[in-house]
Regions:
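N-terminal capping segment at the start of a domain
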Residues: 2-32
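General structural feature for long, well-ordered alpha-helical segments within catalytic domains
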Residues: 12-19, 32-40, 70, 83, ...
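Short amphipathic alpha-helical segments at helix-loop
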Residues: 21-25, 56, 109, 113-116
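Generic secondary-structure signature for well-ordered alpha-helical cores
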Residues: 22-29, 45-50, 133-140
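Short glycine-centered, acidic/aromatic-flanked micro-motifs in structured strand/loop junctions
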Residues: 26-28, 58, 89, 148
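A non-catalytic alpha/beta surface segment that caps or lines the substrate-entry region
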Residues: 29-79
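Active-site metal-coordination/substrate-binding segment of hydrolases
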Residues: 43, 68, 75-77, 81-148
Length: 148
């Protein structure tokens, strides 16, 4: 396992790359994010996030263009007192990313040349899933976790 770390958060790079490669292949151009939203929701559940902590808002019903889904929101309790933290990324990609076929070239992930990659959006999503996997054991120790 390739692990990058600093004093606070070790990062499982191999897992992040696996999630990224998967997410890059899931369709999700702007307005059509239902498939990638479902894939991310499923990945979060697989790393231990309770389904009750995952929700979608109704932003898609309040904007003037047709969209499939609202924002994916995950509410998790903290591990210590203090102000809440927000981690944010986006799910959608530009139309040039439709049908993306990512591949590895050494330590790089690239498109096959027929589409754009969509790595900006999906890298953030993969990182958040891996960070949740890393912290889930500590979060589960917080009183009230089972009440979600």
């Amino acid at each position: 396992m390739d692990v990058m770390s600093n004093a606070s958060v070790p990062l499982d790079v191999a897992s992040a790359v696996d999630h990224l490669m998967n997410f890059l292949t899931v369709e999700g151009v702007t307005g059509q994010e239902a498939d990638i939203a479902a894939a991310v929701s499923d990945a979060l559940k697989k790393v231990g996030v309770p389904a009750a902590a995952i929700r979608f808002d109704d932003a898609n019903t309040r904007i003037p263009v047709p969209t499939q889904t609202g924002n994916l929101i995950v509410d998790l309790p903290g591990t210590r007192l203090g102000p809440p933290l927000l981690f944010s990324t986006h799910l959608d990609t530009v139309p040039l990313c439709a049908g993306a076929k990512p591949r590895r070239e050494g330590d790089r992930i690239v498109s096959d040349g027929t589409t754009a990659l969509g790595g900006d959006a999906r890298t953030g999503v993969a990182l958040l899933v891996v960070l949740e996997r890393r912290t889930e054991r500590r979060i589960r120790e917080v009183p009230g976790w089972g009440d979600l």
